[in-house]
């Protein structure tokens, strides 16, 4: 019996991106078809463990010090001394995954500063549909137990299914991090572990905003309200948000490090994340009072002011209504008046849910669009409007607003189209251990002028932004994972430009667009095309005699110029141009030139071929000097983009990223020889494609031999 030959498949960075895009178009990454995180298949792993009679141990997030953290919880930290990893079955005789359903009291904070995450989990328990999108049914420490559990998390536009083992950090016989009040329930501790896994460690979860957890559990988009500047109808906004299943969180800002986790006179914790779990208006002494219900993940520290559990205000409320609203003492949940809420708290976060999270609800839903993008040094990281020379190279997205809001939505206000823009930077929490923190990000919105409305999706250039002011922008540039702002603008076309504050700050991002009415969106990018010069048909008689004499002197006895001879000639000439910064032409770049011009295929250049190349290089030199704006002898990566267009090539942003990576120096400068090599390579590839595209449909098909032939000698 012959064995099947195994053929390895290797994906380069570019091909991997293409493969990922194709998979997404087929539905991979939606909640119903979540990506298996790190390739781990929960069912396969569980069955394998059951068949072998072993308990699962996750080597992708092993029970070792590095999984706890890298600094404060690092391997040599005193805070991690004595921590062991144990399974719930080693701690209790009858551990449970969930007892009587998941409730807000299942989440009690441990030694980790992730109250923001726990507040989000607490809000999640209010909605069974949302909860079980994150915590799949059918998991247990009894039936089919194999020491393996899984959870589904939203990560930057994709749902991922995350597998964990049930080895949890233990100290002095107790869970170190999140735990339930019951003591024998472990779903919240295991969910925290899954979240730590996707972020690299438990320590990576320290510090954050509730909105981050909201979004990673729902795929929704979050709005922020500074309560000192809140709209007059905020209570109605909260009521409507709770009715729509939105998740809400709030906090009290700190004025110094000493304030962190400080407890106020009325038992509110500063710098601490609370979840908003309800809102209700009650009749109190003949007046309607607006109340709001809060939850503190710590559990035991509660508000002691008006409308707290033991306050006298409840004695003047109808007994039936009072019994419906009052909660148990010391569970971390409490009521307070909306007036006190506005006075005591600093900010409110509301996570609006995507339509797929609200399938069973007969309510109005957002229209949503998501784009992924990158900022790359020298090509697409142009910085904010403060840097006009480079701002235009940032990614651009066009929005077309057609329908205004329903009249009921804006009352007497001027009509317009409401939408939320949210810009999120990717993977920054996971990269903390490498010293990389959040970049300062934001975005600007520009109205498309009438003469450009309806035009193809062409990337807007520098002159447009120099001549036009922004129509709207994010409230601020800030170093948070996400910046979001609600807008209401008249119908029309607009261009959104997301950016870092400073140029050349690299990162990946997700831009999301939530609109109340249907709207059109498209990423602006130039269409790939080349205005190539006609291939010259010259005879030797048409060439200048002086050039012929020069050629005879350079070519030698065979009257042809080889690759090595071409390098010697070009480097001798370029060395005389003292204004050019160059290391000289390499053999590889000269070989590319010969391949482009060699018509008879002998690997050398004859008189006519060398004449055409010579004129081409003179033209390239003219373009190079034109776009070397500071006369430094080299071009910046951004100047090169304009120079390439001047040479007749229109490329999209992904190709510019590749070109800058390949042809620029570490300081993002492009010298003359690299510029020439780039243009020669571009022309060669365009001409190859044009030759093969016989039916002019922009698509060519070839076998492996032809592919290798083209790529080896281009």
UniProtKB/Swiss-Prot annotation:
Its cofactor is Ca(2+). Activated by micromolar concentrations of calcium and inhibited by calpastatin. SMART domains: calpain_III (SM00720), CysPc (SM00230). Ca(2+) 4 binds at residues 628, 630, 632, 634, 639. It catalyses: Broad endopeptidase specificity. The active site is at 115, 272, 296. Ca(2+) 1 binds at residues 109, 114. The modification Phosphothreonine is found at residue 354. It is found in: Cytoplasm; Cell membrane. Residues 527-542 are annotated as: Linker. Ca(2+) 3 binds at residues 598, 600, 602, 604, 609. Undergoes calcium-induced successive autoproteolytic cleavages that generate a membrane-bound 78 kDa active form and an intracellular 75 kDa active form. Calpastatin reduces with high efficiency the transition from 78 kDa to 75 kDa calpain forms. The record marks 15-16, 27-28 as: Cleavage. Binds 4 Ca(2+) ions. PROSITE patterns: CALPAIN_CAT, EF_HAND_1, EF_HAND_2, THIOL_PROTEASE_CYS. Keywords: Acetylation, Autocatalytic cleavage, Calcium, Cell membrane, Cytoplasm, Disease variant, Hereditary spastic paraplegia, Hydrolase, Membrane, Metal-binding, Neurodegeneration, Phosphoprotein, Protease, Repeat, Thiol protease. Residues 543-713 are annotated as: Domain IV. Belongs to the peptidase C2 family. Forms a heterodimer with a small (regulatory) subunit CAPNS1. PANTHER family: CALPAIN, CALPAIN-1 CATALYTIC SUBUNIT. Calcium-regulated non-lysosomal thiol-protease which catalyzes limited proteolysis of substrates involved in cytoskeletal remodeling and signal transduction. Proteolytically cleaves CTBP1 at 'Asn-375', 'Gly-387' and 'His-409'. Cleaves and activates caspase-7 (CASP7). This is Calpain-1 catalytic subunit. It comes from Homo sapiens.
């Amino acid at each position: 019996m012959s064995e099947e030959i195994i053929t390895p498949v290797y994906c380069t960075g570019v091909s991997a991106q293409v493969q990922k895009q194709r998979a997404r178009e087929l539905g991979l990454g939606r909640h119903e078809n979540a990506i298996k995180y790190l390739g781990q298949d929960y069912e396969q792993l569980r069955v394998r463990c059951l068949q072998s009679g072993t308990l699962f141990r996750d080597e992708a997030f092993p029970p070792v010090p590095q999984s706890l953290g890298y600094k404060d919880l690092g391997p040599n930290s005193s805070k991690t001394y004595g921590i062991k990893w144990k399974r719930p079955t080693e701690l209790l005789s009858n551990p449970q995954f969930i007892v009587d359903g998941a409730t807000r009291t299942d989440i009690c904070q441990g030694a980790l500063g992730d109250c923001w995450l726990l507040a989000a989990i607490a809000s999640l328990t209010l909605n069974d549909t949302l909860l079980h999108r994150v915590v799949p049914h059918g998991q247990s420490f009894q039936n089919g137990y194999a020491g393996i559990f899984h959870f589904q998390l939203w990560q930057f536009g994709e749902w991922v299914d995350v597998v964990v083992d049930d080895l949890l950090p233990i100290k002095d016989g107790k869970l170190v991090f999140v735990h339930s009040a019951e003591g024998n329930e472990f779903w919240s501790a295991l969910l925290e572990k899954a979240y730590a896994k996707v972020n690299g460690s438990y320590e990576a979860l320290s510090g954050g905003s509730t909105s981050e957890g909201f979004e990673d559990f729902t795929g929704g988009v979050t709005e922020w309200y500074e309560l000192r500047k809140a709209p007059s109808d905020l209570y109605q906004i909260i009521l409507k948000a709770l009715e729509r299943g939105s998740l809400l969180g709030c906090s009290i800002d700190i004025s110094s490090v000493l304030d962190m986790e400080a407890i106020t006179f009325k038992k509110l914790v500063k710098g601490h994340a609370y979840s908003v779990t309800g809102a209700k208006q009650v009749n109190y002494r003949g007046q309607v009072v607006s109340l709001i219900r809060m939850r503190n993940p710590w559990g035991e520290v509660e508000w002691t002011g008006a409308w707290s559990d033991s306050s006298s205000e409840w004695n003047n409320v109808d007994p039936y209504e009072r019994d419906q609203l009052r909660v148990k003492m010391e569970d971390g949940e409490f009521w307070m008046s909306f007036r006190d809420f506005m006075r005591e708290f600093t900010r409110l976060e509301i996570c609006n849910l995507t339509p797929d999270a609200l399938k069973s609800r007969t309510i109005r839903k957002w229209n949503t669009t998501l784009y992924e993008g990158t900022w790359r040094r020298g090509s697409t990281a142009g910085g904010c409007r403060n840097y006009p020379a480079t701002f235009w190279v940032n990614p651009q997205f066009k929005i077309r607003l057609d329908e205004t809001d329903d009249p009921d939505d804006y009352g007497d206000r001027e009509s317009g189209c409401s939408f939320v823009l949210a810009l999120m930077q990717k993977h920054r929490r996971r990269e903390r251990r490498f010293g990389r923190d959040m970049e300062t990000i934001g975005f600007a919105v520009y109205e498309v002028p009438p003469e450009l409305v309806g035009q193809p999706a062409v990337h807007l250039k520098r002159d447009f932004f120099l001549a036009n002011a922004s129509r709207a922008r994010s409230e601020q540039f800030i170093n948070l994972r996400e910046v979001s702002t609600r807008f209401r603008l008249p119908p029309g076309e607009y261009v959104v430009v997301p950016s870092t504050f400073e140029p050349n700050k690299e990162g990946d991002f997700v831009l999301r667009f939530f609109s109340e009415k249907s709207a059109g969106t498209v990423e602006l990018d130039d269409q790939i095309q080349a205005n190539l010069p006609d291939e010259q048909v010259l005879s030797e008689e048409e060439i200048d005699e002086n050039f012929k004499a020069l050629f005879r002197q350079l070519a030698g006895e065979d009257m042809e110029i080889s690759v090595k001879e071409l390098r010697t000639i070009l480097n001798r000439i370029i060395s005389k141009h003292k204004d050019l910064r160059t290391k000289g032409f390499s053999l590889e770049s000269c070989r590319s030139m010969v391949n482009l011009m060699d018509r008879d295929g002998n690997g050398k250049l004859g008189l006519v071929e060398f004449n055409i190349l010579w004129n081409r290089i003179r033209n390239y030199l003219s373009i190079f000097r034109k776009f070397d704006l500071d006369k430094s002898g080299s071009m910046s990566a951004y100047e090169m983009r304009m120079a390439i267009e001047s040479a007749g090539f229109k490329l999209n942003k992904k190709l510019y990223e590749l070109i800058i990576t390949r042809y620029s120096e570490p300081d993002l400068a492009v010298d003359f020889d690299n510029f020439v090599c780039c243009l020669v390579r571009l022309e060669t590839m365009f001409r190859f494609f044009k030759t093969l595209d016989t039916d002019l449909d922009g698509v060519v098909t070839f076998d492996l031999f032809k592919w290798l032939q083209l790529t080896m000698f281009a």
